[in-house]
Amino acid sequence: MIPLNRRASQTRGGMEYFDARRKPHNVGKVIAALVLTTLCIFILKQSPGFGGSSVFSRHEPGVTHVLVTGGAGYIGSHASLRLLKDNYRVTIVDNLSRGNMGAVKVLQELFPQPGRLQFIYADLGDQKTVNKIFAENAFDAVMHFAAVAYVGESTLEPLRYYHNITSNTLLILEAMASHGVKTLIYSSTCATYGEPEKMPIVETTRQLPINPYGKAKKMAEDIILDFTKGRKDMAVMILRYFNVIGSDPEGRLGEAPRPELREHGRISGACFDAALGIIPGLKVKGTDYPTTDGTCIRDYIDVTDLVDAHVKALNKAEPSKVGIYNVGTGRGRSVKEFVDACKKATGVNIKIEYLSRRPGDYAEVYSDPTKINTELNWTAQYTDLKESLSVAWRWQKSHPRGYGSN
């Protein structure tokens, strides 16, 4: 018997007994919880990602889903912007070792609609991660930009370059093969040619790279070519481009290298840093080259033209074909010419310090773009050096600390 002075709700043996008089109140709570749960399930079912699926994991008629590796970087972010403007679906994969999350945020703000853009933070050197990305997303094409890309640094850390460029490209190809992705636009470089005896450079110019960066890219190209020989369904474009300058004409994106990488960066970045007073002056490495004024001669291609070439290559890619194209203006300019244009663009009389040559550099490199002009109907439009630098300078001046400032 239960003692008369014990309440029915007291515990016995670790169990709890509830007063029957409280039952209606608890039943009401249960009913309310069931209604709320049902409502949540209904709302969840309406969401694109219900059941582990999303628009990014399904092929959709009329929509081309492009994986942009290195899409948080300078060139990759500009390419992503162009693809999104042209109504492609874009997935950016980047480990942010060289890229900038600020660029991704700009793109996310410009294209917030569901199913337009997603960002995946990942290292393409991890095979399991790469396979997981391909397994969970329905890609129609890959634009492979991701790479460490400084000539000087490559001479100091060659193994890093072979791992990052050559090995990672191999992992991308294996994942493409496993998951049926049949279109590749590969970002290569004029550095694969080395220092040819004859100018301008055509696509059949012998490739004799002289630094680890160029060698790693050449090896990646060779792997791609060998891979496609046994796969007649593959559509591949290899774009060997020259020295990239400029930024988005509307001022949304720019070049923002990490502070620790500035010493290895492009000459345009160094010019702007000097104009902003971030560094005391510009260091020109090499004045004894066999050129008219003793400085290196390069073919400077505006990033807007460059990404246009990538989109045209994507549109023209055909199964069982490999297209190899130089992407340049066809005109070489010396470093001294470049510096003069930068001074005019910034309005700053930049201090110049002349130093000895940088290891792995070559005297003269410029392209013959006839093939890409003819086959892809592409021609560089932004060929005024001062104007390209002026556009880039406007972004740099308003973002002196990169995407962390405005």
From Swiss-Prot:
Assigned EC number: 5.1.3.5
Keyword flag Isomerase: yes
UniProt xrefs under InterPro entries: NAD(P)-bd_dom, NAD(P)-bd_dom_sf, UDP_G4E
Keywords, comma-separated and alphabetical: Carbohydrate metabolism, Golgi apparatus, Isomerase, Membrane, NAD, Signal-anchor, Transmembrane, Transmembrane helix
Co-factor requirement: NAD(+)
Membrane topology: Single-pass type II membrane protein
GO cellular component: Golgi cisterna membrane
Main location as per UniProt: Golgi
Keyword Transmembrane among UniProt keywords: yes
Record: active site: 213 (proton acceptor)
TM region positions: 27-44
Lumenal side: 45-406
Cytoplasmic face of the membrane: 1-26
Subcellular location: Golgi apparatus, Golgi stack membrane
Annotated metabolic or biological route of this protein: Nucleotide-sugar biosynthesis; UDP-L-arabinose biosynthesis; UDP-L-arabinose from UDP-alpha-D-xylose: step 1/1; Cell wall biogenesis; cell wall polysaccharide biosynthesis
Reaction(s) catalysed by this chain's protein: UDP-beta-L-arabinopyranose = UDP-alpha-D-xylose
Binding locations of NAD(+): 65-96
Enzyme class: isomerase
UniProt-listed Gene3D superfamilies: NAD(P)-binding Rossmann-like Domain, UDP-galactose 4-epimerase, domain 1
GO function term, MF aspect, one: UDP-glucose 4-epimerase activity
BP term (GO), one: capsule polysaccharide biosynthetic process
Family named by the database record: Belongs to the NAD(P)-dependent epimerase/dehydratase family.
Name of this protein: Probable UDP-arabinose 4-epimerase 3
Provenance organism: Oryza sativa subsp. japonica
Upper classification of the organism: Eukaryota, Viridiplantae, Streptophyta, Embryophyta, Tracheophyta
Gene designation: UEL-3
